[in-house]
């Protein structure tokens, strides 16, 4: 079988000093995405992608590890130094992910809660009976 000679187009390594860290913390998983100001993704990581499975995915420690992985990737590849943090969702990994980014040496300019709140939209799921 002949090898495809076209190959992938190399993306130019650009230097991005300011970025936005999007932390989506659901009850089951935590997704951390670091983007530039325009919203183009630079690096991302999830709790499940770091090897945590089942109920361990939704722990604060799993969110911390995901934030460290995404943060290191954005720092090493693009040189991101300052971030605005946007936190979405009610999950347990909210604060620990923000703390992990601060511990990596990021200067956190602002922390905003952008959790979507319905103005009486869809009917919520019924209460759990355990």
From Swiss-Prot:
Record keyword Heme present: no
GO biological process: translation
Residues in coiled coil: none
SUPFAM superfamilies on file: Translational machinery components
Keyword Zinc attached: no
InterPro entries attached to this UniProt entry: Ribosomal_uS11, Ribosomal_uS11_bac-type, Ribosomal_uS11_CS, Ribosomal_uS11_sf
Gene Ontology cellular component annotations, sorted alphabetically: ribonucleoprotein complex; ribosome
Membership in a protein family: Belongs to the universal ribosomal protein uS11 family.
PANTHER family with a match to the protein in the record: 40S RIBOSOMAL PROTEIN S14/30S RIBOSOMAL PROTEIN S11
Role, per record: Located on the platform of the 30S subunit, it bridges several disparate RNA helices of the 16S rRNA. Forms part of the Shine-Dalgarno cleft in the 70S ribosome.
Protein name per UniProt: Small ribosomal subunit protein uS11
Source organism: Psychrobacter sp. (strain PRwf-1)
Record gene name: rpsK
């Amino acid at each position: 079988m002949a090898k495809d000679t076209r190959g992938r187009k190399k993306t130019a390594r650009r230097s991005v000093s300011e970025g936005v860290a999007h932390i989506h913390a659901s009850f089951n998983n935590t997704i951390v995405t670091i983007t530039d100001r325009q919203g183009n993704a630079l690096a991302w990581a999830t709790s499940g992608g770091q090897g945590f499975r089942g109920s361990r995915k939704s722990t604060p420690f799993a969110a911390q590890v995901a934030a460290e992985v995404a943060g290191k990737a954005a720092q090493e590849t693009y040189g991101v130094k300052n971030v605005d943090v946007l936190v979405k969702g009610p999950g347990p990994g909210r604060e620990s992910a923000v703390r992990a980014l601060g511990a990596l040496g990021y200067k956190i300019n602002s922390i905003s809660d952008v959790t979507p709140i319905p103005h009486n939209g869809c009917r919520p799921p019924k209460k759990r009976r355990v």
